[in-house]
Amino acid sequence: MSHNQFDKKSQAWSALFSEPMSDLVKRYTASVFFDKRLWQADIAGSLAHADMLAAQKIISSEDHNAIQSGMATISAEIESGAFDWKLELEDVHLNIEARLTQLIGLAGKRLHTGRSRNDQVATDVRLWLRGEIDLIGALLTDLQKALLEVAEKNVEVILPGFTHLQVAQPISFGHHMLAYVEMFSRDAERMSEVRRRTNRLPLGAAALAGTSYPLDRERVAVSLGMVDEKGHPCVCQNSLDAVSDRDFAIEFTAAASLCMVHISRMSEELILWMSQNFGFIKIADRFTTGSSIMPQKKNPDVPELARGKTGRVVGHLMGLITLMKGQPLAYNKDNQEDKEPLFDTVDTLKDTLRIFAEMIGGQLNPATGIKEGGISVNPQAMEQAALKGYATATDLADYLVKKGLPFRDAHETVAHAVKAAITHQVDLSELPLAVLQQFNPGIEKDVYEVLSLRGSLNARDILGGTAPNQVRAQIARHRARLG
């Protein structure tokens, strides 16, 4: 076949076929306009493969040098926007290979020795996803640090804690923020685990059965950084599995879905808290929009969209699982459909993490070195909401238990006290001692220390509790972890 096979034939394998591919089928099967984002991974994998082929004397040093030079030219063309992506060449891999062959001739054809697009694409996606996971890990750190800053400023601010969206017990607003730090720290751990399993080399598996060429797969793995924590090469051990499974992409999307679920839960609270009915917080105007008809409105579009985009990412997870579930070994064209949901999941998660870190923690003003525009807290509104909800009722029950009353009896006694407070439209702490003693004569003046919001907060002085000194200990632990 001539050097110009990619120009004269619709595909690299078309000598077998008696008629060309129709334009409709070309458009239907092409992936180049979304998988071209893999170009850096594709070139990196090809260069590592070429290095190994030369070291194994499978290609000459002259061909090796030509491949390196050609790939440098292609990289420059892509970066400058001069590269001509062609639909008829179907994907990123054949586009780059065709251009390489055009630039350097026969040496470009020899690059594919011992390699199939099946192991090539699996390698590219793993390399690309590894880099994206690293970026996501850094963004998760930024978001956690933003939450820590808010927590540190609001350790002493009292927020009504809720169960069933009913006022339950008073908590530190800082403690509440730290709950999300814990969630995002686990998300970061999951991403790290996904990265470890993603960072394995399929290249050398060829189409499905391996190759008869004496490839040094471990050399390629090391050169691409596909190594474990001790520097040992990580190579896919079964050629069928290497080219056919996309569990690493599914696992990443599952981890991303969990992260988005945590963001969605936080979004729901931000939306509630900034509503007029709560009035607990404000977010900077740049994260809100107005109404086309109601001039008084500031709508929380960013958290609302994040809540909505969570469904989109979870949908991608279901799509990928469904994509894989019916495929026999080894590679099938179905797997081309893994890229758009994977790419969109990565883009959505990165964008969401970036915007939430800024929305919560603010943006650094380079002139002053001070962060501006983060969450603005209304402590008075929070405290009033806690008082209205009889948030210290459990504290009164605990007080009676310490006086010797069984908890179930204490629970019933306090229910009567709350009923009396509701009738008189006062907080429990505002009921006269004589009234409280009607429910249990063992109640004494010290009960008012227990019934105060501050007293309730301070009483939860246990590891993981909401007492301010425990919250500060949590903050210190997270700061040490995040650096």
UniProtKB/Swiss-Prot annotation:
Main location class: cytoplasm
A molecular-function term among this protein's GO annotations: argininosuccinate lyase activity
GO annotation terms (biological process): arginine biosynthetic process via ornithine; L-arginine biosynthetic process
Top-level EC class as recorded in UniProt: lyase
UniProtKB keywords: Amino-acid biosynthesis, Arginine biosynthesis, Cytoplasm, Lyase
Protein's UniProt keywords contain Lyase: yes
EC code: 4.3.2.1
SUPFAM superfamilies according to UniProt: L-aspartase-like
Subcellular location: Cytoplasm
Classification via InterPro entries: Arg_succ_lyase_C, Argininosuccinate_lyase, Fumarase/histidase_N, Fumarate_lyase_CS, Fumarate_lyase_fam, Fumarate_lyase_N, L-Aspartase-like
Entry GO CC: cytosol
Pathway: Amino-acid biosynthesis; L-arginine biosynthesis; L-arginine from L-ornithine and carbamoyl phosphate: step 3/3
Catalytic reactions of this protein: 2-(N(omega)-L-arginino)succinate = fumarate + L-arginine
Entry keyword annotation includes Mitochondrion: no
Family statement drawn from the similarity comment of this UniProt entry: Belongs to the lyase 1 family. Argininosuccinate lyase subfamily.
UniProt-recorded name of the protein: Argininosuccinate lyase
